[in-house]
């Protein structure tokens, strides 16, 4: 909820905001006025702070205390506690609280408890009492301690309650904060955060936001990247994208003397963070130094195996995980068990039971932990996800493992990244690591009786096709049958065992979420439509092979959907969720399967001239489904991408031919434009061209090359000479050979990947730069002939230049161009008329200008066209003061997608596609690869 502070904050001008910066722990001279003036010129997205408003310049910073036992809803029949205590009682409370903090005597603590049980009261900074001001002083000192203990670049800010009208909201305006002076983005995000207020007792996600959820539930919440949230879950999402904010953790702050939550500490950073244990530990120690508390965190000690039976069970489980992962190349498999309880601080002072994770939200409820039990990792990249699992826990019904635990049946989900955070607390990490298919099964051992062991297997990230997933699942089940000795599959009800058949697996569908959610890449942002409802379907395959729908709806927050039309978000880990199963014999509607059956090849051909994404949008399917439909029709690659590549080859060949004196009269080339008239099969386009008859080849003059994706296609260029030229077999072979030579340095783009998708993270890194705007490489026809510079005769036939003396003009490209140059040494060397082609100018100059963006930094330097990727990375690393190997470089391809530069062939194609002497690149951090290739504990 975004609230205008000028209309809601009382007592303006009575308190001052402070911050902690570098240099001896001195407070930064940041108040609301200074910050607003600093960023009054910030771009319109997000909106700048209102510099002219005087009513919010220095809002008060109250901290409030209340006893939960007396906190009654306003609409309840019972009389509510008075908003403020009488003066005498309030004075007594202040005196007792102050005395308690000084001596911590049992007598004074009991006195405070007695007053708390009688009155609901609020202590504010603006009442000028020593006790109320002490809250802010202690928080400020705690942040000083934290600043001294960390060297990370981050923003730490405090959210504290303030009265707005007749209710209380959380605000960070006027509260202490720690800020890295080097990060302008975090400073801007701090200024934006001061404009927000969040409810302390709201009933929907939009009102609560991240600070409100943490304050209300009194448990931490964290994510590797806030851009995985929806805008409902995280109202500051657009600002986070604009200012390159990623990792965030929010912790409740308790005052043990009054047993209440008094504030929320939020840690914000511009890098993606997987493990927050170190930061949380430092915050907790800093708070303890000033007699405040937060969620405790302990190192995870190895579980002591107290009997041989448990040890034998874990050894057998480890064997199963290892065999299945190694045989089927699964990236990760792990075990969840009902967690061991320990005592932690809960609700500010009460001792409750919690699991080993530092979340601390289970409060004695049944939950599962994956720490210190058997697991197996094959893909080293998944160690980060494994570490995140250790820090989290799952309650009954959360994630695939939680559902296997509560349903007592094997469960499978085709795409766990489609869950909401409430249904699967690890969903942000699943999106970050590109995980999709997941299978879980609950086992018991004859050695340990009723002890449950939930085995969780993650399918390879590239295994997303439904048929491939089903085949792999069947193979996993068959292998597990052979491995089970003392372990048995947990049955449902009176059934002791469930046969390991795919017909007995519960298929967890999230179709309601799929229709409203999409991701821009495997690491990209979360987007949702307003109508998403957060329900999900569970399908059971009966003995006849038919799916039985089991609807499992989570009624988590009353009237949430009706009031907010957003995803319900209550407790971050879903402890308030309740499962209700409604069985139905009616098979569920599968929108994706229906679309696949109805989209024919004839329909697809109508969209071949445009981009795949635009075609998918027009047909009402996602790009992934569109690619699957193409594969079913034998189309391995979207045609317009191939046409673009052929056109680039034609342009090269044209320049080679023109370098021979008098060749302009004999040859006339043009790009391939117009709608695609011939079916595209599994064979390559070049083979189709070779086999095509002269009449069919003549029709190719009307083929269209994809231009600007958001603009209309260019008019077909008519050229009769193309049919004559293209009908000759020799030209086809020459064209293919030239392309082969240009691509021989591993030009398959395996590392670039046509599936690479433009992430909002990447766009945010380039915010404000031209590369972030709609910049798409134009077709060769237009890049070689700018309309405003070329005569009318040239625009009609873009590749036919005026009959002027020609000199040698060859592109120094991969091998073939240099070799061909030697064939024309006898050509007359005459002055060459400079073309309008940016590509030609770039190659003639021998150098290009590189503009590389990294977070808020942009570096610019000249680079030789013949340089290698290694040399390019060295130049970037030297200027950004980074280590080579710790970052990736990406370029914007002709589909407006950020593609990784992995080899010299990618760099060559980048220069081809750019068509300009200025090449813009994006530099991003490499995800941490932790640990070795496999491991286990038990």
Swiss-Prot record:
<dbReference type="InterPro" id="IPR034891">
    <property type="entry name" value="PB1_NLP"/>
</dbReference>
<feature type="compositionally biased region" description="Basic and acidic residues">
    <location>
        <begin position="580"/>
        <end position="597"/>
    </location>
</feature>
<feature type="domain" description="PB1">
    <location>
        <begin position="847"/>
        <end position="926"/>
    </location>
</feature>
<dbReference type="InterPro" id="IPR045012">
    <property type="entry name" value="NLP"/>
</dbReference>
<keyword id="KW-0539">Nucleus</keyword>
<dbReference type="GO" id="GO:0005634">
    <property type="term" value="C:nucleus"/>
</dbReference>
<feature type="domain" description="RWP-RK">
    <location>
        <begin position="585"/>
        <end position="666"/>
    </location>
</feature>
<dbReference type="InterPro" id="IPR055081">
    <property type="entry name" value="NLP1-9_GAF"/>
</dbReference>
<protein>
    <recommendedName>
        <fullName>Protein NLP3</fullName>
    </recommendedName>
</protein>
<dbReference type="InterPro" id="IPR053793">
    <property type="entry name" value="PB1-like"/>
</dbReference>
<feature type="compositionally biased region" description="Gly residues">
    <location>
        <begin position="12"/>
        <end position="26"/>
    </location>
</feature>
<keyword id="KW-0238">DNA-binding</keyword>
<feature type="region of interest" description="Disordered">
    <location>
        <begin position="1"/>
        <end position="26"/>
    </location>
</feature>
<keyword id="KW-0805">Transcription regulation</keyword>
<dbReference type="Pfam" id="PF22922">
    <property type="entry name" value="GAF_NLP"/>
</dbReference>
<feature type="compositionally biased region" description="Low complexity">
    <location>
        <begin position="748"/>
        <end position="762"/>
    </location>
</feature>
<dbReference type="Pfam" id="PF02042">
    <property type="entry name" value="RWP-RK"/>
</dbReference>
<dbReference type="InterPro" id="IPR003035">
    <property type="entry name" value="RWP-RK_dom"/>
</dbReference>
<keyword id="KW-0804">Transcription</keyword>
<feature type="region of interest" description="Disordered">
    <location>
        <begin position="557"/>
        <end position="597"/>
    </location>
</feature>
<comment type="function">
    <text>Probable transcription factor.</text>
</comment>
<dbReference type="GO" id="GO:0003700">
    <property type="term" value="F:DNA-binding transcription factor activity"/>
</dbReference>
<feature type="coiled-coil region">
    <location>
        <begin position="640"/>
        <end position="662"/>
    </location>
</feature>
<dbReference type="GO" id="GO:0003677">
    <property type="term" value="F:DNA binding"/>
</dbReference>
<dbReference type="InterPro" id="IPR000270">
    <property type="entry name" value="PB1_dom"/>
</dbReference>
<keyword id="KW-0175">Coiled coil</keyword>
<dbReference type="Pfam" id="PF00564">
    <property type="entry name" value="PB1"/>
</dbReference>
<feature type="region of interest" description="Disordered">
    <location>
        <begin position="743"/>
        <end position="769"/>
    </location>
</feature>
């Amino acid at each position: 909820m975004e609230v205008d502070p000028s209309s809601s904050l009382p007592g303006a001008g009575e308190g001052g905001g402070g911050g902690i910066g570098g240099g001896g722990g001195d407070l930064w001279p940041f108040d609301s006025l200074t910050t607003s003036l600093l960023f009054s010129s910030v771009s319109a997205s997000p909106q700048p702070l209102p510099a002219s408003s005087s009513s919010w310049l220095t809002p008060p910073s109250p901290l409030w205390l209340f006893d939960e036992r007396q906190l009654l809803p306003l609409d309840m029949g019972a009389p509510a506690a008075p908003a403020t205590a009488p003066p005498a009682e309030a004075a007594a409370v202040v005196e007792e609280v102050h005395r308690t903090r000084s001596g911590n005597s049992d007598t004074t603590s009991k006195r405070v408890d007695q007053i708390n049980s009688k009155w609901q009261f609020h202590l504010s900074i603006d009442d000028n009492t020593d006790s109320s001001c002490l809250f802010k002083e202690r928080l400020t000192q705690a942040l000083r301690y934290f600043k001294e203990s960390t060297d990370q670049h981050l923003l730490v800010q405090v959210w504290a309650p303030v009265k707005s009208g007749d209710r209380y909201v959380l605000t960070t305006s006027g509260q202490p904060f720690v800020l890295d002076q080097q990060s302008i983005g975090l400073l801007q995000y701090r200024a934006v955060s001061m404009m927000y207020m969040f409810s302390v007792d709201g009933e929907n996600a939009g009102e609560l936001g991240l600070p409100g959820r943490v304050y209300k539930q009194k448990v931490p919440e964290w994510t590797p990247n806030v851009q995985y949230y929806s805008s409902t879950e995280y109202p500051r999402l657009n600002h986070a994208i604009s200012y390159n904010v990623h990792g965030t953790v929010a912790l409740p702050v308790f005052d043990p003397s009054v047993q209440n939550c008094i504030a929320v500490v939020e840690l914000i950073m511009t890098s993606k963070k997987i493990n927050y244990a170190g930061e949380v530990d430092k915050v907790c120690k800093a708070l303890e130094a000033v007699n405040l508390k937060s969620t405790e965190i302990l190192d995870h000690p190895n579980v002591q195996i107290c009997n041989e039976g448990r040890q034998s069970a874990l050894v057998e489980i480890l064997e199963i995980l290892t065999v299945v992962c190694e045989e089927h190349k699964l990236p990760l498999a792990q075990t969840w068990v009902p967690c061991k309880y320990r005592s932690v601080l809960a609700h500010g002072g009460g001792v409750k039971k919690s699991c080993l994770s530092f979340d601390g939200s289970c409060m004695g409820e049944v939950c599962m932990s994956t720490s210190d039990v058997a697991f197996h990792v094959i893909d080293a990249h998944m160690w980060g996800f494994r570490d995140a699992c250790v820090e989290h826990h799952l309650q009954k019904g959360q994630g695939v493992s939680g559902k296997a635990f509560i349903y007592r049946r094997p469960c499978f989900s085709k795409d766990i990244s489609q869950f909401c955070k409430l249904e699967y607390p690890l969903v942000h990490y699943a999106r970050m690591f590109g995980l999709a298919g997941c299978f879980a099964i609950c086992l018991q051992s004859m050695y340990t009786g009723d002890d449950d062991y939930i085995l969780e297997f993650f399918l390879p990230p590239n295994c997303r096709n439904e048929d491939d997933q089903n085949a792999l699942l069947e193979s996993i089940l068959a292998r597990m049958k052979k491995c089970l000795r003392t372990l048995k599959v947990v049955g449902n009800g009176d059934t002791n065992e469930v046969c390991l058949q795919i017909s007995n697996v519960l298929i967890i569908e999230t179709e309601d979420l799929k229709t409203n959610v999409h991701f821009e890449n495997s690491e990209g942002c979360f987007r949702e439509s307003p109508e998403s409802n957060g329900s999900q379907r569970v399908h059971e395959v009966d003995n006849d092979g038919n799916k039985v729908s089991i609807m499992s709806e989570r009624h988590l927050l009353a009237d949430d959907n009706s009031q907010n039309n957003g995803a319900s978000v209550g407790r971050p880990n879903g402890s308030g969720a309740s499962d209700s199963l409604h069985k139905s014999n009616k098979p569920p509607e599968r929108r994706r399967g229906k679309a696949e059956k109805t989209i024919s090849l004839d329909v697809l051909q109508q969209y071949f001239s445009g981009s795949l994404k635009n075609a998918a949008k027009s047909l009402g399917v996602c790009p992934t489904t569109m690619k699957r439909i193409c594969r079913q029709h034998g189309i391995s690659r979207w045609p317009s991408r191939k046409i673009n590549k052929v056109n680039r080859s034609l342009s090269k060949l044209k320049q080679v031919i023109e370098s021979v004196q008098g060749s302009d009269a004999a040859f006339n080339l043009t790009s391939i434009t117009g709608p695609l008239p011939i079916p595209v099969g599994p064979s390559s386009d070049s083979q189709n061209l070779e086999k095509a008859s002269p009449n069919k080849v003549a029709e190719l003059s009307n083929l269209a090359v994809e231009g600007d994706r958001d603009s209309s296609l260019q008019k077909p260029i008519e050229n009769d000479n193309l049919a004559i030229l293209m009908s000759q077999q020799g030209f086809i072979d020459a064209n293919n050979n030239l392309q082969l030579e240009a691509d021989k340095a591993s030009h398959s783009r395996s590392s670039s990947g046509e599936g690479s998708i433009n992430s909002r993270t990447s766009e945010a890194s380039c915010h404000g730069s031209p590369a972030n705007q709609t910049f798409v490489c134009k077709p060769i026809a237009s890049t070689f002939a700018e309309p405003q510079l070329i005569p009318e005769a040239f625009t009609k036939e873009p590749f036919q230049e005026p009959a002027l003396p020609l000199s040698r003009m060859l592109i120094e490209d991969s091998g073939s161009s240099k070799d061909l140059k030697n064939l024309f040494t006898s050509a007359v060397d005459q002055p060459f008329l400079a073309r309008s082609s940016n590509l030609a100018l770039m190659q003639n100059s021998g150098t290009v200008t590189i503009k590389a963006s990294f977070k808020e930094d942009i570096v610019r330097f000249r680079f030789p066209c013949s340089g290698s990727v290694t040399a390019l990375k060295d130049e970037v690393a030297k200027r950004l003061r980074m280590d080579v190997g710790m970052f990736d470089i990406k370029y914007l391809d002709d589909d407006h997608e950020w593609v990784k530069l992995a080899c010299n062939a990618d760099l060559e194609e980048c220069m081809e596609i750019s068509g300009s002497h200025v090449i813009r690149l994006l530099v991003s951090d490499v995800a941490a690869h932790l640990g070795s290739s496999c491991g286990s504990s038990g």
